[in-house]
Amino acid sequence: VYKRQVLASAECVSSNGFQTKYAKSDENGFVTKDEFINQIDDETIVASLMWGNNETGVIQPIKDISKELKSINSSTLFHSDVVQGIISDNVDFHRNGIESAAISAHKIGGPKGVGAMFVNNKFKLPSFLHGGKQELERRAGTVDVPGIAAFATALQEQQTRFDEEVGLMNDERLIFEDKLKNALSVCLL
């Protein structure tokens, strides 16, 4: 259920001598808690699960999985791609047990090439671009201040419009279901 880019990163880690495991999803793209947790052991360093899938709409049981994961291995970093749910009220990293999260601006109307990463302070990540002290010494180079400002603006606009958009989608769904029911003479449950 992950994007090709994420799978390629997992393959890169594997090619550097680390064991990589994959949890299977059902035909709808849903990963059960048991399937995910069965991949975790006392040597697991990172576990990653996409919160909401942009193609299928499936929302994974992040909170339940993170809680169970920590009962098996408290030192495993739990990462999630949260961009599909970042504007909803449910995205509370701490409450949901997310210790690392990736967010891409263009998915919410912001500029391409800008993103954000949250990492709990208890995890010390090495720099991946060396030579400067920008971005907490994790990524050297000129900071894209206009891009970051545009990302913040897009996020604020999306959060402001969230309830309105959900209401509109629900109204459209009801109209669609009514037209489908009338056209096919069926009952929708």
Q: Which residue stretches match the model-derived regions?
A:
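Pyridoxal 5′-phosphate
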Residues: 3-189
